[in-house]
Design a protein with these regions (language model features):
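N-terminal targeting signals for export/organelle localization
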Residues: 1-53, 179
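Residue-level recognition of short loop/turn positions
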Residues: 42, 57-58, 153
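Generic structural signal for well-ordered beta-strand positions
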Residues: 61-62, 157
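Conserved redox-active cysteine motifs that mediate thiol-disulfide chemistry
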Residues: 67, 75-92
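Active-site acidic short loop of glycosyltransferases
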Residues: 67-69, 99, 124, 141
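Hydrophobic beta-strand anchors of alpha/beta hydrolase catalytic cores
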Residues: 72-73, 103, 147
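Structural microenvironment flanking redox-active thiols in thiol-disulfide oxidoreductases
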Residues: 84-122, 130-138, 171
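Thiol/disulfide oxidoreductase modules built on the thioredoxin-like
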Residues: 117-124, 130-178
C-alpha cells in the first residue's frame, strides 16, 4: 500500500503525461482516445455486437476497432475495493445496453490469474484486456477505478474517477451515445 501511495505521489509531483487528455475531457473538448492495442484476457462477448467479436477473437484488440459504437472503458484491478463494488453495476449495465454500447474492462497492474478470477466471480459479460504502464500514463490515470466514455467516433465525451454510481453511469452513457 505504501508503494502504491508513493507511486501516486511521484506521478503527481512529476506530472502525468495524460494530464492534457484529462484536462481536455474536463473542458468538454472531446479529445480522441489514444489508439492502443491490448492483450485480451477475458474473451466474453455476451453483450458485444456480433460484428465486433472478430476484432478481439485473435487475442489482441485495438481500441480503434470499436469505432461505430459508444464505449464504456473501465480501468480496474482485482485488488481494488471500489472496483469490486462497482463490478456488478457494470455487468448489469452491459446486459441492459447489449449490442448498443460496448463495455471494455482494462485491467491495470494486476496478475492475469487474479484478474480472471475477479472477472469470473463477478460474471463479467464483456471483454476485458490487460494493460501496462503506458496505458495508465496515456489516459492520465491517477487511481482506480476510472471510467472513460467514448462516442462512436472514438472521442472521449466524459470520465468518472472513483467508484461509479448508477446515475453517473447512465448519464455518461447517454452523453457518449449522443456524441
Amino acid at each position: 500500500m505504501v508503494a502504491l501511495f508513493a507511486a501516486l505521489v511521484y506521478r503527481v509531483a512529476a506530472g502525468n503525461p495524460g494530464a492534457g487528455l484529462v484536462n481536455a475531457v474536463r473542458a468538454k473538448r472531446a479529445p480522441a482516445a489514444p489508439d492502443m492495442r491490448f492483450k485480451v484476457i477475458w474473451p466474453h462477448f455476451e453483450t458485444w455486437p456480433v460484428k465486433l467479436r472478430a476484432a478481439a477473437e485473435q487475442g489482441t484488440l485495438a481500441l480503434s476497432a470499436l469505432r461505430g459504437y459508444p464505449v464504456v472503458l473501465n480501468f480496474w484491478a482485482s485488488w481494488c475495493t471500489p472496483c469490486e463494488r462497482e463490478a456488478g453495476l457494470l455487468a448489469a449495465a452491459a446486459k441492459a445496453k447489449r449490442g448498443r454500447v460496448v463495455f471494455l474492462g482494462v485491467d491495470v497492474h494486476d496478475f492475469s490469474g487474479d484478474a480472471r478470477r475477479f472477472l469470473g466471480r463477478h460474471r463479467v459479460p464483456f471483454v476485458a484486456v490487460g494493460s501496462g504502464n503506458s496505458t495508465s500514463d496515456r489516459f492520465g490515470l491517477v487511481g482506480l477505478p476510472e471510467t472513460f466514455y467514448l462516442d462512436r467516433h472514438g472521442r472521449i465525451r466524459g470520465m468518472t474517477r472513483g467508484q461509479l454510481s448508477a446515475a453517473a453511469l447512465r448519464s455518461q452513457i447517454e452523453v457518449a451515445a449522443r456524441g
